[in-house]
A protein has these predicted regions:
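A short SAM/SAH-binding and catalytic strip from SAM-dependent methyltransferases
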Residues: 142-152
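A short glycine-rich, Lys/Arg-flanked "PGG" loop and its adjoining helix->strand segment in the class I
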Residues: 155-162
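Class I SAM-dependent transferase core
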Residues: 4, 8-69, 120
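Single conserved hydrophobic/aromatic residue that forms the stacking wall/gate
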Residues: 163-173
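Short glycine-/acidic-enriched loop or helix-start segments at secondary-structure transitions
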Residues: 86, 154-155
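Conserved SAM/SAH cofactor-binding pocket of Class I
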Residues: 61-139, 145
Length: 173
């Protein structure tokens, strides 16, 4: 692996990212760019490797400091192309943490992509093809999302999902 690329990943604070993790992140980038030719995984404006590293990978990896490492699961709401969920799963693998990352996405095509990536990189994920707004509750240690919905909607959604509302209709979006 190119030292420039390895040094680039050193921006991920406090993780001492291994070459193996860097290789997996680079594989993820290649898969994103390839699949993006067919379906909209990321914006066309950020379709170059350096832009994907900075705008998506490094940005998504910042959440790792807030993930409850003692929990069995972490949930990514409206994961889209897998950010931040796939990045967290790659980092968890490096940390030898057995936490499962639940990836909620309603798009069939994106779910197929997420499953392919998870299988190829041997990530501990579960891809759940459902509209998160139609789910009554979830059990998870950490909830994360990126570029999903405005913050007030996310906070209301999380409040309803974690505190077992009798019905999604009881919550207001």
């Amino acid at each position: 692996m190119d030292n420039v690329i390895f040094n680039y990943y050193s921006k991920i604070t406090g993780l001492n990212v291994s070459r193996e993790t860097c290789n997996e992140l680079e594989s993820l980038i290649s898969m994103i760019l390839e699949k993006n030719k067919q379906i909209n995984i990321i914006s066309k404006k950020t379709c170059e490797k350096d832009a994907v590293r900075e705008r998506h990978i490094i940005d998504s990896a910042q959440i790792i400091d807030f993930v409850d490492l003692n929990s069995n699961t972490t949930t990514d709401l409206g994961t889209g192309g897998g950010m931040p969920g796939l990045i967290v799963a790659i980092i968890m693998k490096k940390l030898k943490n057995s936490m499962k990352i639940n990836l909620y996405e309603k798009s069939y095509h994106k779910c197929v992509f997420l499953k392919e990536v998870s299988k190829k990189l041997k990530l501990n994920t579960e891809v759940i093809q459902k509209d998160i707004f139609k789910i009554n509750n979830i059990e998870t240690g950490t909830v994360m999302s990126r570029a999903f919905k405005p913050m007030p909607i996310i906070l209301n959604l999380v409040s309803c999902l974690l505190y077992t509302s009798p019905s999604p209709r009881d919550c207001q979006w």
